Amino acid sequence: MISNNLIEQLEQRGLIAQVTDKTRLSERLYQGQISLYCGFDPTADSLHLGHLVPLLCLKRFQLVGHKPIILVGGATGLIGDPSFKAGERKLNDIDTVHQWVNKIREQVEPFLDFDCGNHSATIENNHNWFSHINVLTFLRDIGKHFSVNQMMNKEAVKQRLSRTDSGISFTEFSYNLLQSYDFAYLNKNHKVELQIGGSDQWGNITSGIDLTHRLNRRSVYGLTVPLITKADGSKFGKTEGNTIWLDAKKTSPYQFYQFWLNTADADVYRFLKLFTFIDLNAIDALEEQDKKNDKAPQAQYVLANEITEMVHGKEGLSAAQRITASLFTGNPHDMREEDFSQLAQDGIPIVRLETDAELQKALVSAQLAPSRSQARTLIQSSSISVNGKKQLKPEYIFTSEDRLLDRYTLLRRGKKYYCLIIWQ
């Protein structure tokens, strides 16, 4: 099962930003199974899209027979990684961080196989070893291996020191030592030979390689995946300023699906290589097919379907597709209670109204019309639909028949603008 060209495959997908000693790492991977890890600090109660590429990279290694370890930073999450951050992170209390650790553990489990023999995935928490090290031992046994001069020359630290509005605290400055020790500890106790992470972690990874060599006298490797950018230069992983989370309670499967569906043509084929396991030849064939097709490209649908199912499962994908189809046609009658809940969460604007409200008032309250007179004009011009049906009566008052599931009514102005009424 061990692949002798995994590094080459990752490069072809654009998944390698930096790698230490690529030739020797490739040779080591060819020789047999290795253990590798990627760390995820609990800086929130959910992972977001930025975590997805390294997480899926672990899966790519596991699929060819290597053993992945998820390291949840129960200790490092209490400190905060300063890497390329403009200012000091807010320190979260221990109870909060421990709650986030548990949520992240639950979140990563579906991505890897924890029951596949000798390459089963495992999850570790660095709080388990740091909680047993006192400060004197750490400074004597670990700190002595670090040069402050070299630490200050790390690009992430240099950027912080160059800012006049914020420096860097000793707390965050010491983060590099903690992450480095993680690598040395995992190498000694779990035979880990490779750390992967985002390209912003390069300085921390190379420090860990150096410390592991000093403490354990073993050769280990580092590999970073690129930080994802969009072709137009805008930030990846956000929509209208809001982070796209992996937790369905923070970003609904519908909104998650829409994010990928709205991927620009300039990005979509690259994202298929980065985020899916579709064969590269199949992706190239899809691109050629889309170029020849006069209709809308299919790549966005393939991308949205693949990743939504991967993160939210078949039910999450089905719900996202059902909601999308209902909004496209303007007919919400096939939607379920949980579908309306997703729309209310973050899908479209909502307005809560009392019984027997007028349509004109609802349109103004929903900001689909700036005034009652404009609402009247929109109704008379056939621009307003109620649950998919044109409503032409300017003085229309909602009835119980307009309430889907006895609670919801979908308003639409034109083809693009929606609002969900939730009846009180």
From Swiss-Prot:
GO terms, molecular function: ATP binding; RNA binding; tyrosine-tRNA ligase activity
UniProt binding sites for L-tyrosine: 37, 175, 179
Residue intervals of the S4 RNA-binding domain: 357-414
Subcellular location: Cytoplasm
A single GO BP: tyrosyl-tRNA aminoacylation
Role summary: Catalyzes the attachment of tyrosine to tRNA(Tyr) in a two-step reaction: tyrosine is first activated by ATP to form Tyr-AMP and then transferred to the acceptor end of tRNA(Tyr).
Protein name per Swiss-Prot or TrEMBL: Tyrosine--tRNA ligase
Gene, per the UniProt record: tyrS
